[in-house]
């Protein structure tokens, strides 16, 4: 199993090219099941979860071809299997997103209950309840979701009990081929949901209101393939910006979208960073300045993203002052705190809040990645810690960050992938 070996690196400097968004690419790839003709997707990151999604589509009989560094072509002409098996689904929670497309186009789907990061329950009931309102018959049996519909799904007025990105995406895809109008209230507003909606519209879907809390979908008879480019990864962007702030550096993120990161950029400015943006780039300058402590509360978009919480734990660990970070989206999402404490961070947990007292320096240590974003926080900590940091179990990192060690090296970071 690979590890990352990280040495204190000084101030990061230079340009980093941001990859396509994993959390947009995964549902967009699943949407390929809805298309009757070839579907071409570009700016697809080369990640473990993306590879798992492609393998899942192949398992169903679709032809999936990767070309260049970022292109995927999907053909469903020979799709003839409707079961997403445990062996694939167990490694990636987003596999549940195949449920809506299979059911909408083929009327049948068997999907193993999903896996992914162990950061809380994240139940699938909202997905199932919405599909049942659209006429699906669903039972959960022997670890599988077994869904059937006679004829086409029917449009429905769905009010979601809580905001769920995955459920919004699943219902959006299912409703695109349903009979009649579907209204989703209390829908997730994340940019990745909007990106999926824009992709579906390019395929011929009729969708209004994506990016608001009420989305209207008028079902159509069929969807066709198209050429679509995945949005930039806002969480990767934010992670590099935090790394630059923590190391007191100056970097520019290109192929980025500042409009999707307003809450994160505001907190970085509160921490003392100078931020400059263009249409597709963000520059952060923290040269010669120690970050100031910033209080964080994670909330659904457009609020502060839960996927940036761990990175700001590191920033606050080295900041001037004391800060609190409150996690409201997922339970059990402070698993990085004990690992950062091993590096000398002064942190204490009180329920869903972490109280962080900033100190001058961290010390290198052997630490263990517990989930995707926690692993990114440990890498950032290693860049600024005195001595050597070894991050174990970086397969979590490979699920969501493309060539992270190479990108940090390009900014002057001393990061090396080593075999166990």
Swiss-Prot record:
Keywords: Cell cycle, Cell division, Cell shape, Cell wall biogenesis/degradation, Cytoplasm, Peptidoglycan synthesis, Pyruvate, Transferase. Its main location: cytoplasm. It is an enzyme of class 2 (transferase). Pathway: Cell wall biogenesis; peptidoglycan biosynthesis. It comes from the Bacteria. InterPro entries: Enolpyruvate_Tfrase_dom (IPR001986), Enolpyruvate_Tfrase_sf (IPR036968), MurA_subfamily (IPR050068), RNA3'P_cycl/enolpyr_Trfase_a/b (IPR013792), UDP_GlcNAc_COvinyl_MurA (IPR005750). Pfam families: EPSP_synthase (PF00275). GO terms for cellular component: cytoplasm. It comes from Shewanella halifaxensis (strain HAW-EB4). Cell wall formation. Adds enolpyruvyl to UDP-N-acetylglucosamine. UDP-N-acetyl-alpha-D-glucosamine binds at residues 93, 307, 329. GO terms for biological process: cell division; cell wall organization; peptidoglycan biosynthetic process; regulation of cell shape; UDP-N-acetylgalactosamine biosynthetic process. The active site is at 117 (proton donor). It is found in: Cytoplasm. Belongs to the EPSP synthase family. MurA subfamily. Gene3D superfamilies: Enolpyruvate transferase domain. This is UDP-N-acetylglucosamine 1-carboxyvinyltransferase. Its EC number is 2.5.1.7. HAMAP family: MurA. It catalyses: phosphoenolpyruvate + UDP-N-acetyl-alpha-D-glucosamine = UDP-N-acetyl-3-O-(1-carboxyvinyl)-alpha-D-glucosamine + phosphate. The modification 2-(S-cysteinyl)pyruvic acid O-phosphothioketal is found at residue 117. One of its GO terms (molecular function) is UDP-N-acetylglucosamine 1-carboxyvinyltransferase activity. Phosphoenolpyruvate binds at residues 22-23.
């Amino acid at each position: 199993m690979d590890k990352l070996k990280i040495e204190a690196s000084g101030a990061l400097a230079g340009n980093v090219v941001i990859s396509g968004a994993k959390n947009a690419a995964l549902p967009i790839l699943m949407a390929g099941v809805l298309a009757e003709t070839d579907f071409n997707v570009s700016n697809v990151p080369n990640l473990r979860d993306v590879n798992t999604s492609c393998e899942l589509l192949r398992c169903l009989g679709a032809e999936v071809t990767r070309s260049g560094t970022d292109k995927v072509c999907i053909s469903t002409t020979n799709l003839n299997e409707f079961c997403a098996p445990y062996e694939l689904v167990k490694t990636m929670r987003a596999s549940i997103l195949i449920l809506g497309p299979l059911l909408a186009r083929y009327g049948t789907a068997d999907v193993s209950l999903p896996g992914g990061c162990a950061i809380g329950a994240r139940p699938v009931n909202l997905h199932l309840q919405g599909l049942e309102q659209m006429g699906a018959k669903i039972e959960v049996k022997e670890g599988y979701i077994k869904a059937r519909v006679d004829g086409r799904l029917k449009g429905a007025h769905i009010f979601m009990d809580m905001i769920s990105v995955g459920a919004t995406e699943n219902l959006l895809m299912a409703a695109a081929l349903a009979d009649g109008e579907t209204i989703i209230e209390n829908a997730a507003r994340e940019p990745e949901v909007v990106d999926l909606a824009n992709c579906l519209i390019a395929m011929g879907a009729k969708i209004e209101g994506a990016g608001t809390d009420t989305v209207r979908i008028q079902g159509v008879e069929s969807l066709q393939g198209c050429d679509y480019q995945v949005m930039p990864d806002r969480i990767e962007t934010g992670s590099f910006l935090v790394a630059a702030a923590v190391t007191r550096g100056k970097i520019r993120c290109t192929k980025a979208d500042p409009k999707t990161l307003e809450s994160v950029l505001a907190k970085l400015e509160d921490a003392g960073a100078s931020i400059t943006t263009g249409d597709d780039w963000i520059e952060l300058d923290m040269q010669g300045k120690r970050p100031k402590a910033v209080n964080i509360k994670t909330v659904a978009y457009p609020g502060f993203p839960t996927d940036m919480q761990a990175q700001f734990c590191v920033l606050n660990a080295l900041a001037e002052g004391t800060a609190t970070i409150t996690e409201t989206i997922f339970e059990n999402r402070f698993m990085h705190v004990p690992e950062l404490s091993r590096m000398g961070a002064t942190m204490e947990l009180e329920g869903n809040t972490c109280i962080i007292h900033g100190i001058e320096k961290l010390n290198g240590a052997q630490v263990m990645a517990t989930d995707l974003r926690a692993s990114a926080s440990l890498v950032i900590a290693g860049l600024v810690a005195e001595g050597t940091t070894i991050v174990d179990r970086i397969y979590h990192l490979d699920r969501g960050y493309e060539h992270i060690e190479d990108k940090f090296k390009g900014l002057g970071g001393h990061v090396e992938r080593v075999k166990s």
